[in-house]
Structure formats: structure tokens, C-alpha cells
Regions:
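Catalytic cores and motor modules of nucleic-acid processing enzymes
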Residues: 25-27, 37, 54-59, 63-76, ...
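Post-DEXD/H (motif II) to motif III coupling segment of the RecA-like Helicase ATP-binding lobe
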Residues: 434-523
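Interdomain helical connector at the RecA1-RecA2 junction of SF1/SF2 helicase-like NTPases
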Residues: 246-255, 486-590, 607, 611
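Conserved segment of the helicase C-terminal RecA-like domain
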Residues: 698-727
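Inter-Walker segment of RecA-like/P-loop motor cores
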Residues: 370-411
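Conserved C-terminal RecA-like helicase domain
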Residues: 556-663
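ATP-dependent helicase/translocase motor core
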Residues: 2-351, 360, 364-375, 404, ...
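Conserved RecA-like ASCE ATPase "motif II neighborhood" in helicase/translocase motors
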Residues: 396-428, 432-443, 457-466, 644-652, ...
Length: 1000
């Protein structure tokens, strides 16, 4: 008999591992086998799918067996042996409680029905408690194959379902790579075939739904159809995604052999899984969220508890977990469980100190503790010397403090409480911003301008540690995504290598793995320094294929502090956000932007400039400014609250509500701020080292509708950012600037293979954008596939497909940042996005996922349509109604402000070495304005048309005047012709001088 490599074979293998009954058949219906002794893996009971009651989502046989063994009097009280109204009332009560409270709370606390208290689960026994151990052994952990769960779609079946005492806790969809299906297919099956309206899939009825193949594991806590969000549950391999090879079996067997054992699952239910409620302060609406730990969170907490239980107080631990990896929950779970940790039958720690400045962590600790104890009796906030002693006397086990108050706590620990044992959890990678921040510290940072030697919270903690030495009666648990050298030396694990003593983290979850797993987004993929932006724009003048209208769109690099520079950069940011983010429906239209500035003065300037320009655009959106303390601006004392019109503490909540879309920051919210709706960042501040990583990482938080992010940087370059990320990311994937000419080269190479012709591209794009049926596209694509198969050898096929993917990837990036369009590129990109999934793959490649993506193109089509139409708003934006006051959108500079304009010119274009600077200045301020003002067409436009048309005629007149200077002043002509930044500045300046002058 050959090996069973089918999906059912994998299912049987898992069940055999869990039950210890090799490929056994279920017991007969209504027959509950006795639980076997919990030895090794043979500790799950094999359930029978026929025992499952679909109406009440319960395995009646297993539930009855548990109650008969533990609370026998309830069998008769609830008439469980008969399908009677009495039994139905009990089952209805049970399911009602699960629907209201969730399976986690029902298992932990049981239910009340009539006069009876019903225990539905016995938790982990304390060591030495024989009776508790006997009760725990009476729990019935069962696994059922091919569970038919639906009353309507009676043939629908889940591959596996896990039950505790007859109550479902988890479901499985299994796939097998040997049959060319993967975990992605399992996820699609959940999204497509598992109706979230089914009772079993309602919120809170199961702790997790697992998609599993022989290589990867994903899970979802709340099925929502296509909106279901599956998170990775993998061990990681080589600091990346996936799982290591397993010499003993499948790569994923850790899930059922180590994680979902009865004791392991019980631990998760008791200490990790939870439902938290968030109340919207404005609407009062409560939102519920179910939490299940990811693998690295479960792994780090369990490893820390094991090691701390063995060594007791006095050890140091460094946990390097990537930004966005869920450190807050990891810290909360660890803090809670350290309370009950024992060493030699005594508490390992008397008190747990948590050092953090993040309100979110404070709340998560409270949410976690709330599941098991009274928060007020367990948690205290230490802000002054003596608070620790007071809380200890009150019996509080967890004390939360800020980094600024931390020295007082350390003094108490080292002096008054040297005989007690402490665990100190430090969330030290997050500067004190956005939560209970120290205004004095933040203001000092703002004044310093965030240089590389800026003292972050991590530095402060290190300095405090150095000053007071590490206390022998305390263990330190330091969590960070970006450990500095001092942090590694203070908290890392020492290990010898050669004649050196090195240090490493106790546990790590790398940025690379988080990105590979799709849990955070790669902020380096679309990082664009403005210098590169300019280089890209500059290359178009010699390339006739480009759309010159887009090339004329203004984009300048203004880094000076005067209002004119801020205004122009603000326009660039606002225009980009509207046209490249909102217009493309990023994050389902919910995208937000962060503007990172170098100080409070600059932030306030941006706030006013962005606010004013949003009004001029008639945009419905608004901006929020964030800085600490009070600032003198224009002779008036202002705060963020006075400018925003609401309290500072409301900023995190307001930015996710419309109409707010821009968050303008001065050394605030740049670290420790977790907001998945942040999509775009505009940086006008020098960044380097850890600060650069922490700042850009604000964008990386995942969201079900978030597929990319964008950074536009006015001050830093790719090499600086690369060096900043390298220590914390094993593989540097940020490339140098992308040359748009590569698209010409790729297109030429693809065209040369003659797999398609221009008419096929035109035809498919026209059909697609016209909304035709899908079957009208296939004949065109299939003809190209036939040409690909028949006319190209294998090497040519590999080369063609590789270049096609490169074109799609490169254009997808460049298309969002170039301020001009190329219709042939856009059309080829649309065409290749359909063609590539149809091209035969190498034998080892499975394109089933690609084919499914090619069919379901709704969101992508919307983006592509918007991308192709993005030039239309440009044209429309230039057409304004004739203003009733005869003016334009803003008052142009008056002649008496010419010195300011010239100073801006000299500052910005100081690199131009004029042979005769005085003569050039005279030409710009006198000769050229006089000649342009005398132009007849320009005079007519000023008198008889609007400002928009007057500007058009002005630019034509200026061009004629400059051409006339070619013989007499080649220097000025050359700058005007070769330097588009100077050309635009000169046009703005001359128009400002001449427009308000009376016509001759």
C-alpha cells in the first residue's frame, strides 16, 4: 500500500499524533470513549462528527460525559439523556452565554442556570494539589474530523475541530503541498466557503481558526468573509518567515505536538487568549476584539517564565522584537504571569515594575489583569518617591511608572526594599512621546532638533542603570526593536567568541521576519529622497515620450525656514496625498499622513501652511499639530491644544476620525505610536541611526486593507537610511534610486520577444477599462500565451517572465511618484498584470494563487483606473471660476517685499555662480519685468481674462523675453533653459512683480 499524500492523509496523520490512535475510526455515535492517561501526545479523544448538535454548536456526548464525571447531579437536573424542553433550555442558556461572553470566559468561569452553578472546565492544577490534578484530568479534549457544522449547507465540513468538554474552541482547514495546495488556499477557503453568519463562526465562539499546510500556519480570531485577517503562527527560519526543516516530521507539527496539547491549550486559555472591549468616547459604542497570541509572543513569554523561574531574581534579559510585533501584549502577558511565578515553591518576585510612557501599554496591562483579578487591587501607578512602599503595603503586585519617575523607584528598591524581589519590565525603545510625556524633555529634544546624539528613552534608562548599578534583588526584562550597544551590554546575554565576550538578545523576532510574514510593511520599498525625486523629473526633458504637462508640475526642494519654502513643500505634500494616496483609495480610503518636522517652530509653520492650502483646494480634510509645551509663535503663546481646538490627550483618537488626515509632529508620536491607518510620511528633518528606524517604522503597522506605504524625504538620502536600518535588519533590501529609463529598457526587451503586439495591448486595455466581461479578455491573453510557448525557448521564457514582473514592480513604484505620465507604460502595466499569471511557470512553481488573484481584481482595477486618470484632475484643477474679487487663490507678493523674494532666491540658488551677480539681479528686478509687462498678449489677458489665463500668457511672454536675451546674456538664458527649478522660480517672481501693475 502506497503512502497517502492526500489532504485526508494529512488530516489522519494529525489526528493520529493527537490521539495516539493510528488512523483510527471514530467511536460509534453516542459512545464516549474514556479519556486516556495524558502521556506524551496521546491525550486527545477522537470525537464523532455525528455527536455534534448544529443548532447549539456543542458535542453533546462529550459534554454529557464531562458533566457525568464531575457534576453528576446535573445530568438529571438538565435531563441531558433526553431531547426534552429541559435540555433545550440548558443548551440555549449555554449558547447564549457563549454568544454574549465568549468561549474563553465561559470556560474560565462557567455559567449559572437556574439554581445551578455549572463548571465547564478545570484549569491548570497548582503543583502538589492532588485534587486539582484529578479534576484537570477529567477534562475532555476531543478532536473531530470532517465536522459538518451547518444546518443549511449540510454538506459543508471542516477538516478538523477541537473541543473542550464538548464546546468548540478551534477549527482547522488543512492543505497539502504535495497536492499543489498551500496555506493560502486554506485561507481562501475560510474566506470564501465559511459563512461568518454560521453560529460556529460567530465572534467569540472559537478562540482561533487555523489555516495549516505542511510548511506554514496562519490563524484568524474572527471570520468576516473576505475581510478575514489571518496572522502568521510560524516559528521563523533564518531570521525570516516560515519554519525550519523538521528531521522528525512535518515542519508544522509543532502546532499540534507542542502548542495545542491539553496543557498548552489550557495555558493559552488561562493566560493569553482574551476578549477586550474598547469604548468610543464620542459615540459610546463598544467594540470587541478577541486576542490570541502569535507564536513569537507565546514563545518569548514562556521562555522568560521558564528561565526566571529557574534562576529567580537578579538576571537580565534583552528581548529584541520588531516594531509592530505586539510587544505591548507580550509585556502585559509577562507582567501578569510573573505575579504567580514560583521558585523553590516561593514567589520568584514580590512585585512587578513596568516602565513605560505609552498609554496603550498601560491599558493593555489593565485589560489583561481584568480577565483574572480586580485591576484596582492589583495595579498601581508610581509617580513619587514613597509610592512603591505604599503600593506594596496595599498589596498591589504590578506597579507602572514612567522613565522620568524610574529613578525614584530604583532608589526605593535599592534602599528600603532590598530584601524584596522585583521584576522590572522596561519598554525602553519608546521615547516619551504621545502618552504621559515629560514636556520638559520633549521641549529640550525639540530645541536640539533630533540629532543622532539625541538622548532617547533607551539612553536615559541606560544612564540610570549605569548610575545605580544593576540591583541584585531585581531581574530586568528590556524590550526593544532597536538595541544600542549599551543596551546589549547591559541586558544582553554574554557569550564567548574567540577571545571576545559578546552579547546577544535572549529572544528575537526580527524586522525581516515580521516583513516576510506580512505582519508589518516594508517602509524601505517606497522610500524616496527628494533628491532622487528631482533626478527623476530632470531626466524627462530629453525624453519625448513623456507627458510634458505632468513634467511641468511643480516640485522643488525647499529646506529653508522661510514661509515661502514651507508653503511650497506643504503644497507638494497636500497635492501628493490627494492625488497619489486618497485618489488611489489607499487603505480603503482611510489613509492618514504624518509630517515629521525638525522642531516646534517648523511644525507650527507647516500646520498653518497645510491648513491654508487645504482650504484653497476646497479639500474636506484638516490637519492636527503635535508638540509638547507652550511656544511663542508670532508674538503669541500657543500650545497644540490651542491650535487644534481640542485637548492634547485626544490627538490619537482624533487623527483616525474624519476630517483629520495630516498629523504634523515635532518630536512627538515618532516612536511608540501604533496607528495602522498611517500610510504616507513626509520627512523634513535630519534622521540617522535608531531615530531613523523608529521614525519610519511608524508606517509599518499592518491593516487588512493596507498593501503599501510611501515615504517622501526632503532632508535625508538613501545611504543614511540604509546605514540606519542595517544593524536591525539582516538583509538590506533598499536599493538606490530607480532610474525611469529602466522602464524604457525593460519595455524594449519585452517588445523584442514579440509575445504580444501593440494592437493586443490596446484592445485588452480598452476592454478592461470599459468594464467588459472577463471572458472577452481571455482570447487575447491566450493568444499571447500560445506565442510565448511556441516561439520562445525555456531560457527566453524565463527571461521574458522575469522582465515582465520587473516592469510591473518598477512601474508600480515609479508610477506613484513621477509627476508625469506615460500612457504606453500604463497600458503595458495593465496588460502584463493579466498576462503574467497566465504564463506557464517553472515546474516547481505553483501559480494557482496567481490565477486567483488575476480573477479577483476589483481593488487593483480601481487603483489602476485612478492612476490612469490622475492626469485629468490636473487639467481640471487648472480651471477655476472667474473670481468675483478679480484676484486669484492667494495674494501675490507686493513689490515692497522684493527683498524677501530675492533673499529666498539667493538662499535657494546660491550654488549658481553668476559672473556678474549685480547685473543679473538688475535684469530680474528691472529689465525682464518691464519687457514682460509690455507684452500685448499679456496685457490683454490681465484686462479681459482671469488670473489663470493671465499666468499662461505671462509664461509665454517671459519665454519670448528670455529667448531675446540669448545673444546678449547667454548665462541667464542657459540657467533658464537647463535648470527647471530656476525657470519656475523666475516665472513665479516675475509674475508676482507684474500682475498687479497697471497695464500701459
Amino acid at each position: 500500500m502506497t503512502t497517502d499524500v492526500s489532504e485526508r492523509g494529512l488530516e489522519a496523520l494529525i489526528v493520529a499524533d493527537m490521539t495516539g490512535l493510528p488512523l483510527a475510526s471514530p467511536a460509534g455515535p453516542g459512545m464516549a470513549e474514556e479519556p486516556e492517561p495524558f502521556i506524551g501526545l496521546h491525550n486527545w479523544i477522537l470525537g464523532n462528527p455525528q455527536d455534534y448538535d448544529r443548532a447549539y454548536t456543542v458535542d453533546l456526548v462529550q459534554l454529557r460525559a464531562f458533566l457525568a464525571a464531575t457534576q453528576e447531579h446535573l445530568i438529571q437536573a438538565f435531563d441531558l439523556d433526553h431531547d426534552s424542553p429541559t435540555r433545550q433550555k440548558f443548551l440555549a442558556r449555554l449558547q447564549g452565554e457563549i454568544g454574549k461572553r465568549g468561549i474563553i470566559d465561559v470556560l474560565r468561569n462557567g455559567i449559572k442556570h437556574g439554581a445551578h452553578d455549572v463548571t465547564l472546565f478545570y484549569g491548570t492544577p497548582t503543583p502538589g494539589n492532588v485534587k486539582a490534578a484529578e479534576r484537570f484530568a477529567q477534562n475532555r479534549f476531543s478532536v473531530t474530523r470532517q465536522l459538518r457544522y451547518s444546518r443549511d449547507e449540510t454538506a459543508n465540513a471542516l477538516d478538523l475541530a477541537l473541543f473542550i468538554n464538548g464546546l468548540p474552541v478551534a477549527t482547522f482547514e488543512l492543505k497539502n503541498s504535495l497536492t499543489k495546495q498551500t496555506v493560502e488556499d486554506a485561507i481562501e477557503q475560510y474566506k470564501r466557503d465559511r459563512d461568518p453568519r454560521e453560529k460556529l463562526f460567530e465572534f467569540g465562539r472559537c478562540v482561533a481558526h487555523f489555516a495549516v499546510d505542511d510548511a506554514e500556519v496562519r490563524f484568524c480570531t474572527h471570520l468576516k468573509g473576505k475581510a478575514s485577517w489571518f496572522l502568521p503562527f510560524n516559528q521563523g527560519w533564518n531570521d525570516g518567515a516560515g519554519n525550519p526543516p523538521n528531521p522528525q516530521g512535518l515542519k508544522t507539527d509543532y502546532l499540534w505536538k507542542r502548542i495545542l496539547t491539553p496543557t498548552g491549550l489550557t495555558d493559552i486559555l488561562e493566560n493569553y487568549a482574551q476578549i477586550v472591549e474598547r469604548k468610543d468616547p464620542k459615540t459610546g459604542k463598544v467594540k470587541r476584539e478577541q486576542i490570541f497570541p502569535r507564536y513569537h509572543q507565546l514563545d518569548v513569554v514562556r521562555r522568560l517564565l521558564t528561565d526566571a523561574g529557574h534562576h529567580g531574581a537578579g538576571k537580565r534579559y534583552l528581548i529584541q522584537h520588531s516594531a509592530g510585533s505586539g510587544k505591548s501584549n507580550s509585556i502585559a502577558w509577562l507582567a501578569h504571569q510573573l505575579i504567580g511565578l514560583k521558585k523553590d515553591e516561593e514567589p520568584a518576585f514580590d512585585s512587578i515594575i513596568v516602565v513605560t510612557d505609552r498609554r496603550i501599554l498601560d491599558q493593555q496591562i489593565r485589560d489583561t489583569i481584568k480577565q483574572f483579578a480586580q485591576v484596582g487591587a492589583t495595579v498601581g501607578h508610581a509617580e513619587h518617591s514613597g509610592d512603591l512602599r505604599r503600593f506594596i503595603e496595599q498589596g498591589k503586585k504590578i506597579v507602572i511608572t514612567t522613565v522620568q519617575k524610574f529613578p525614584f523607584i530604583l532608589d526605593d528598591i535599592g534602599n528600603q526594599h532590598r530584601n524584596r524581589r522585583f521584576a522590572i519590565l522596561i519598554d525602553e525603545a519608546h521615547s516619551s512621546q504621545g502618552g504621559k510625556a515629560s514636556a520638559a524633555v520633549s521641549m529640550a529634544l525639540s530645541a536640539a532638533g533630533a540629532e543622532e546624539d539625541e538622548e532617547t528613552t533607551e539612553d536615559i534608562v541606560n544612564r540610570i542603570m549605569e548610575a545605580r548599578k544593576l540591583l541584585p534583588n531585581a531581574s530586568y526584562f528590556a524590550f526593544t526593536a532597536t538595541p544600542k550597544n549599551k543596551t546589549l551590554e547591559l541586558f544582553g546575554e554574554p557569550f564567548p567568541e574567540g577571545n571576545k565576550a559578546k552579547h546577544r538578545p535572549f529572544h528575537s523576532y526580527t524586522m525581516k521576519q515580521a516583513i516576510d510574514e506580512g505582519f508589518i510593511l516594508d517602509v524601505l520599498k517606497s522610500y524616496t529622497p527628494v533628491e532622487s525625486y528631482y533626478r527623476l523629473v530632470k531626466t524627462i526633458e530629453s525624453d519625448p515620450e513623456f507627458d510634458t504637462k505632468r513634467a511641468r508640475k511643480k516640485l522643488r526642494r525647499y529646506v529653508e525656514s522661510h514661509d515661502h519654502a514651507i508653503r511650497l513643500k506643504a503644497e507638494i505634500m497636500v497635492d501628493h496625498f490627494h492625488e497619489q494616496v486618497l485618489a488611489l483609495n489607499k487603505i480603503g480610503g482611510q489613509a492618514r499622513a504624518m509630517v515629521v518636522t525638525s522642531g516646534i517652530e517648523r511644525a507650527i509653520q507647516y500646520f498653518h501652511a497645510i491648513r491654508d492650502y487645504l482650504k484653497e483646494r476646497k479639500s474636506p480634510y484638516r490637519a492636527i499639530v503635535a508638540f509638547s509645551g507652550e511656544h511663542d509663535y508670532g508674538g503669541v503663546k500657543v500650545t497644540e491644544a490651542s491650535l487644534n481646538g481640542f485637548p492634547s490627550k485626544d490627538i490619537p483618537d482624533r487623527i483616525v476620525e474624519d476630517p483629520y488626515r495630516f498629523l504634523i509632529c515635532a518630536d512627538k508620536f515618532q516612536t511608540g505610536y501604533d496607528e495602522p491607518l498611517l500610510h504616507t510620511m513626509y520627512v523634513d528633518k535630519p534622521l540617522a541611526g535608531v531615530k531613523a528606524v523608529q521614525t519610519l517604522s511608524r508606517l509599518n503597522r499592518a491593516h487588512p486593507q493596507k498593501h503599501d506605504v510611501f515615504v517622501l524625504d526632503f532632508q535625508n538620502d538613501t545611504e543614511t537610511i540604509r546605514k540606519a536600518f542595517e544593524p536591525y535588519y539582516r538583509t538590506t533590501i533598499l536599493s538606490d534610486e530607480t532610474d525611469p529609463n529602466k522602464l524604457h529598457d525593460l519595455k524594449a526587451a519585452l517588445d523584442g520577444y514579440q509575445v504580444y503586439d501593440a494592437s493586443q495591448i490596446e484592445q485588452l486595455v480598452a476592454l478592461y477599462l470599459g468594464g467588459t466581461d472577463r471572458d472577452k479578455l481571455d482570447p487575447i491573453l491566450d493568444a499571447c500565451v500560445a506565442s510565448y510557448n511556441e516561439n520562445l525557448n525555456e531560457d527566453e521564457q524565463v527571461d521574458f517572465k522575469g522582465k515582465a514582473k520587473a516592469f510591473i514592480r518598477t512601474y508600480g513604484f515609479l508610477g506613484s511618484i513621477l509627476l508625469y505620465t506615460n500612457a504606453s507604460w500604463e497600458k503595458l502595466s495593465i496588460f502584463l498584470n493579466f498576462l503574467v499569471p497566465k504564463l506557464p511557470a517553472p515546474k516547481e512553481e505553483d501559480l494557482s494563487k496567481g490565477i486567483l488573484e488575476a480573477i479577483d481584481m476589483n481593488s487593483y482595477r480601481v487603483e489602476k483606473r485612478a492612476a490612469q486618470r490622475i492626469q485629468l484632475p490636473d487639467t481640471d484643477a487648472e480651471i477655476e471660476p472667474v473670481p468675483t474679487d478679480g484676484g486669484g487663490r492667494k495674494r501675490e507678493p507686493e513689490l515692497d517685499r522684493l527683498s524677501n523674494i530675492l533673499r529666498a532666491f539667493n538662499d535657494q540658488f546660491g550654488g549658481i555662480e553668476w559672473q556678474d551677480a549685480d547685473r543679473v539681479r538688475r535684469m530680474i528686478t528691472e529689465d525682464i519685468p518691464q519687457k514682460v509687462a509690455a507684452d500685448t498678449a499679456y496685457q490683454n489677458a490681465k484686462q479681459n481674462s482671469d488670473k489663470q489665463n493671465a499666468r499662461i500668457e505671462h509664461d509665454k511672454a517671459l519665454a519670448r523675453v528670455i529667448v531675446g536675451l540669448m545673444k546678449d546674456d547667454t548665462e541667464l538664458f542657459k540657467q533658464y533653459s537647463d535648470n527647471p527649478e530656476f525657470m519656475r522660480w523666475l516665472a513665479d517672481t516675475i509674475f508676482g512683480i507684474t500682475y498687479d501693475q497697471p497695464s500701459a
